[in-house]
Every structure is written in C-alpha cells, then in structure tokens.
Design a protein with these regions (language model features):
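Glycine-enriched alpha-helix->loop->beta-strand junction motifs that scaffold or abut catalytic
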Residues: 42-48, 64-72, 88-95, 147-151
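Catalytic cores of alpha/beta
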Residues: 36-37, 78-89, 131, 135-152
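Glycine-rich phosphate-binding active-site loops on the catalytic face of alpha/beta enzymes
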Residues: 45-59, 95-105, 145-168
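Hydrophobic faces of well-ordered beta-strands that scaffold small-molecule active sites
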Residues: 21-25, 50-52, 71-75, 94-96, ...
Length: 179
C-alpha cells in the first residue's frame, strides 16, 4: 500500500526535520502511484531529490524534472556510456557505484573509483557525485573522499545494527571520523 509508505516518509520527516531525505523510487512504482500524484507528494513535502531507477525511457524522468524536482541517476562502476548519457541529461546528483562486484567487468581506461569520478567530471558533470554500493567499512568512506566523491552512501552495514543502537551509534562515529 503506497499510501502507508508515503505517510511513513512524512512521519520520518516530522521526527527528523534536520535530516535531508532522498526518495528512491522505481519508475514502475511511480507509475503505480501515478506520476502527477507522486510529483505533488514530493513537492508538497519538500522532497526535492529523487533517485529514479529502472527507467524504460526518459518520459517520466523528464516530467519530474519539469515539475521542479531533481532526478538523480545511477552509474555502474564500469561506466556504461548509456548511463553516463542519462546522468548528463539529468539534473540531480550522480549515484556512482563505489566498488565493482567480484564478477563485474572493470573499464580498463578507468579502473579505480578516482578514475571514474574524474572521468565523469571530464564529461561535464558538475553536480555532486555520491558513491555507494560497496561502502561497508570506514576506510571505504575515505576511499570515496580521496577519489573526489562528494558523499558516500552507507547502507547495510548500519542497517544490520538496527537492534543494537549503541553499536550502531559507534559505527556511525567510526564512519564520520573518516569524513
């Protein structure tokens, strides 16, 4: 039920007014909610940054951008040209994969995260580049920082500690110390 999901976002926003929330949404979910309803929800709740994934084409993305929201795009570590083009045509931050999967190909021209960030900048992308996927340890945050990334997404490492709040707080401190 998307209504409960949307109500939960508003409740979190009210509980944590100083925390900037990003909305991650799959294009088919936006279609299920209704594009206009989704846009109105984001605008009325000051949720300006949308990470839109699973795009079939640019129609919905362009409609969201035209409404005044910022749409971010994901770029895999091996820097597929079509993903870079999508990022160039968008207006939000770029979500760059920080580390390759074990079986994932690596772009020989840009084998490191630093190379990837520099390449995206050379392509004319001047918006923030947030790096995630593979950021599991505090040292990974330093890797992102040293590569020129503007921020790091840390997910499962923190979420796995949800039942041990003191350990979660300590882990967050460890990550912050590397920023």
């Amino acid at each position: 039920d998307y209504e409960k999901y949307m109500d939960s976002i508003v409740a979190i926003q009210k509980r944590l007014p100083d925390v900037k929330l990003l909305v991650l949404a799959y294009e088919n979910t936006v279609e299920d909610i209704g594009v206009d309803r989704f846009i109105e929800f984001c605008l009325s709740n000051n949720l300006k940054d949308i990470l839109l994934v699973g795009l079939k084409d640019d129609i919905i993305k362009n409609k969201i951008i035209a409404a005044g929201l910022q749409v971010s795009c994901y770029v895999q570590f091996h820097l597929p040209e079509e993903e870079i083009e999508r990022a160039k045509q968008s207006n939000g931050f770029v979500y760059l994969q920080a580390k390759p999967y074990e079986t994932q190909q690596i772009n020989e021209k840009y084998p490191t995260l630093k190379d990837g960030v520099e390449y995206l900048r050379s392509c004319g992308i001047d918006r923030p580049i947030y790096c995630g996927v593979g950021v599991h340890a505090p040292e990974d945050v330093k890797l992102v920082k040293d590569a020129g990334g503007d921020a790091a997404f840390v997910g499962s490492t923190i979420l796995k500690l949800h039942e041990d709040i003191p350990a979660m707080k300590e882990k967050i401190r460890e990550f912050k110390a590397m920023c």
